[in-house]
Structures are given as C-alpha cells and as structure tokens.
Amino acid sequence: MAATAYEHLKLHITPEKFYVEACDDGADDVLIIDRVSTEVTLAVKKDVPPSAVTRPIYGIMGTIHLVAGNYLVVITKKMKVGEFFNHVIWKATDFDVLSYKKTMLHLTDIQLQDNKTFLAMLNHVLSTDGFYFSTTYDLTHTLQRLSNTSPEFQEMSLLERADQRFVWNGHLLRELSAQPEVHRFALPVLHGFITMHSCSINGKYFDWILISRRSCFRAGVRYYVRGIDSEGHAANFVETEQIVHYSGNRASFVQTRGSIPVFWSQRPNLKYKPDPQINKVANHMDGFQRHFDSQVIIYGKQVIINLVNHKGSEKPLEQTFAKMVSSLGSGMIRYIAFDFHKECKNMRWDRLSILLDQVAEMQDELSYFLVDSAGKVVTNQEGVFRSNCMDCLDRTNVIQSLLARRSLQAQLQRLGVLHVGQKLEEQDEFEKIYKNAWADNANACAKQYAGTGALKTDFTRTGKRTQLGLVMDGFNSLLRYYKNNFSDGFRQDSIDLFLGNYSVDELDSHSPLSVPRDWKFLALPIIMVVAFSMCIICLLMAGDTWTETLAYVLFWGVASIGTFFIILYNGKDFVDAPRLVQKEKID
C-alpha cells in the first residue's frame, strides 16, 4: 500500500449514508459510512446516488460516539504552511461535526443537554489552534527516525507507520484504523506548531523549519495534569525538531520537554500559585525508570536541564528529581540544575550564557542529524536535551531557542552557508525570522497547555527583556490565573473526551456532567458581595456620629474579609474541576 492519503475529497450526504469520494487523479474509491448501522465499507464512484448533497472536504478527523449516537468529524478548511522536501504541509483551520442521527427525538431533556455539552467540548478542542497534516509525508517522525526505516515501513499507510504519541485523532480514527483497505481515507493529525521559512545568508538560500509535536499521552491543562502516570508518560511532553534543508543536504536538531517525571500534583485552589504536592506513597522510581527507559530507546542519551527554583515551593521537586537521577545511576542520563529565576534576576538575562557554556561540550557530544544530498547519513544525533521548568513553557522555551541556535550555527558552518568566524546572531534578517518563529512556537505551546500566550517572549523575539514585555507577562499571568481556576475543568474534560480517556455511555443513568454544587459555592460569594457592598454604603452614607459609622464599616468590612478568607480556605470547592476522568488525587 502506498504511504499516502487522499488529498482531494468530496462528501456526499444522504439521509441513510455518508459517501466520502476520493477525487485524486485516477482514484475511484468511495468510503461509505452507514448512518444507521455505522458500518464502514469501500465502494466505487458509480455507487454515489445523484440525489446526495455534495460538499468538498479536506480530510477525515474520524468518528466519535456521544449521547445522541455517532458523529463524523471532517476538515472543512485548510491553510498551506509550506513545502517540506516537495511534500505540502497543511494546517487544519476549520472542522464540521456531523450527526449520524437525523433527529434528536429519541433523547430526554437531560440527554439533550448532556449531548450539547459533549459537542461543545469536542468543538472546544477542534477550535484550539495547531492541528497539522500532510497527505504524503509522515509528520509524526523526526528526520533521523525516518532515515532508520525498512522498506516494509515505507510501504505502510501513514496511519500505520505514524508515531502514536503524536497522532491526536488516533481515538477518532479507531474504526477506520481497524480496516486497512480504507487507510488512504485516514489522516493522522499532529497537534503542536509548524513554521517554515525560505532564508538567505551570504546569498545562499536554505529552508529553515521548526516543528513541535505534542504528545497525546497524559495530555491536558496546566494545573490538572502534572508529573507522570504509571506508564511513565510525562505531562506536557513536546518533541521539538529544527530542520535545515540546503542544496539537497538535510540537518535536524531535536529537543524534548516534559513535566518533572515523578508523581506530583498542583491542583488549583484559588491561590495565585498552589503549592505542588509530591505523592508520599507512590513508587516514584518505577514511573521514573519507565519514563527514561522509553526516552533512551527513542532518543539515546538524555541531558536533563531542570530550570525550577532552588528555594520555596519548587525546591522539593528539584531535590526529588536530582535524587531520582542519582538513584537510577544510568550512564545515559546527565542532570543539570539551573535556577533560572535566581541566575537571571534583575533582568540579567545575559547570565544564560553560564548555562550554555556549561552544556557546550555535552551538546557537541550529542551532535545533530545530517544527511547529504546523496542520501548518505553523515552524522546521527546521539541524544537530546530534555528541558523542564514547572510548566515546561516559559523558561523552557527560552533555553530551547538558545540551544537550537547553537546547533544551527554549527550546521550552517558545516554546510558552507556561514563563513568561518561568522556568527548567526550577526545575520540581522535571519535573526528576526529565527527569534519570531521561536516566540510563535512558545506561544502555541503555552496556549495549548496553559490557555494563554507564553511569558518572556519579548526576550525570545528581541534578545532582551523589555518593560512592555513585563506588562504583557503580567496580563498573561492574570489571564492564566482566571482560566486555571474557572475554566480549565471544562478544557481538561474536552481533551479527555477527544482523546478517548473518557467514553460516553448513553445507557449510564448517572451523568458525570450533573455534579451538584455544595451550598458554599453560591452562599459564600453572595455573602461576601453583600458585606462588601454594605461596607461601601456605610462609608458613603455616614451615620449620626463618626463612631456609629466606624462601627458599621468595621462590622461589614470584617464580614467581607472573613468571608473572603473562608472562600480561599475552601478554594478547591470553587474552582472549575474536571468531571469526566478523575486523575490520581495527590494531596
């Protein structure tokens, strides 16, 4: 089977069936989905009834089962990102969710409401920016992984050969993946970030590409998914690959990021920064070893760069991570702790050079992947930098962009694009492209995990910290606080539904969506607002004597402040918590 998927498709809809027609040159296949039996079959174009309503689509994301029955999810708009070794890369920008059922009359009012909520969850994930695909190229693998494949692998369909860590519609495609004959209709979709630029230095033109692949294992939102699971999958795991294509030569440099790989949590509780909790009873070494065993198999040597604070609430996590590495005693793993905030305080961001100098020799040892124009592998990357902070976002992005630039400097010199002694940061035009692309990558990763753009991107874009950047960081921090406390439960549920961590059972009489709120949820905020309002009224409408006014103000002031602290104490009752999948509670 050719390792391509159909690019041009038409969707024909009748009351009984969906017909997905392949319109590529020479194609005669039609995928038929029975809207009643849900059976999937393959036919030819002459089987499409002329009475069907027809529209163009650009790919099938898959199918999902909700309360009302099955739904077909299709890509309705796409945008060209660029060309990758003569393969077109697309970004999916709009989707449609089509019900198999013609009416909802078979549902009760409660089922209708639940179905509406599940649809909103599905659409929430689909509206998240960052879904990419190609009908001819396997985006889920790095250049180095693709170079080490067998002829049998290259004959597989894109879906079969894809790295399942990065196929975000894997659950939606489960029915199609069970039938190899329809795999050309099944499109593996990546979630993350891709940017491509044609660049020029010294009159030499090359393509520069940046790809971030988000893992769909232990996926979720900032405060609800931390650490690792029992299988060793780390939260917010992202593989970032930087690629250069010059005169037939291809070079790539891969880095990873992922949450501190022990069992810990940091549940929102209305505090600006909840204290992280390390599980006191879990077997940390078991999960830790599983995580790094798989990382070493996939990537080789691991150089861990831990950027968390060495004091305060982050200190126990740094100590635990260091202890785990020491206890494991693997020659394949090296550990570097760099207190980012301490080293760079008072906007001394030039001090990041201390870390770069510290790891320079290790980076040269890890090298990068390079294949020449004849297809011969010149060098392999022997391992990766695995960077992390608390969120694996802001501090991590800064460090990754600096490490990637150092690798790129070496690659471009080796390829003859840069002259001996020339520095990449002196190439103003390219530097602007480079910094903006890495800042855009930072924003994409941050929005997908934390719900807002990244912090510290002014440094990534300009090379220095600015006052405007500090103001924007403040705004994004406040926005994160709101989302993390009051909307992330819904976001987490949406991701769990999309990835199949939760399956809808319409026969289940107890809906997880209808969780009754405790009396405190409504009563305490109302009491606080009333008390605060009365305090203001007493200030504006003075009593007969100043002592009387003071007494009223003190009474209502103490009532409002007291209620505020009671709300804060019971913070976990007021946040928007996930309802579908109960993660391990680590308190």
From Swiss-Prot:
Gene Ontology molecular function: phosphatase activity; phosphatidylinositol-3,5-bisphosphate phosphatase activity; phosphatidylinositol-3-phosphate phosphatase activity; phosphatidylinositol-4-phosphate phosphatase activity
Stated role: Phosphoinositide phosphatase which catalyzes the hydrolysis of phosphatidylinositol 4-phosphate (PtdIns(4)P), phosphatidylinositol 3-phosphate (PtdIns(3)P) and has low activity towards phosphatidylinositol-3,5-bisphosphate (PtdIns(3,5)P2). Shows a very robust PtdIns(4)P phosphatase activity when it binds PtdIns(4)P in a 'cis' configuration in the cellular environment, with much less activity seen when it binds PtdIns(4)P in 'trans' configuration. PtdIns(4)P phosphatase activity (when it binds PtdIns(4)P in 'trans' configuration) is enhanced in the presence of PLEKHA3.
Catalytic activity as recorded in UniProt: a 1,2-diacyl-sn-glycero-3-phospho-(1D-myo-inositol-3-phosphate) + H2O = a 1,2-diacyl-sn-glycero-3-phospho-(1D-myo-inositol) + phosphate; a 1,2-diacyl-sn-glycero-3-phospho-(1D-myo-inositol 4-phosphate) + H2O = a 1,2-diacyl-sn-glycero-3-phospho-(1D-myo-inositol) + phosphate
Record's subcellular location: Endoplasmic reticulum membrane; Golgi apparatus membrane
PROSITE patterns, per database record: SAC
Alphabetical GO biological process terms: exocytic insertion of neurotransmitter receptor to postsynaptic membrane; neurotransmitter receptor transport to postsynaptic membrane; phosphatidylinositol dephosphorylation; vesicle-mediated transport in synapse
Residue span, SAC domain: 122-451
Name assigned to this protein: Phosphatidylinositol-3-phosphatase SAC1
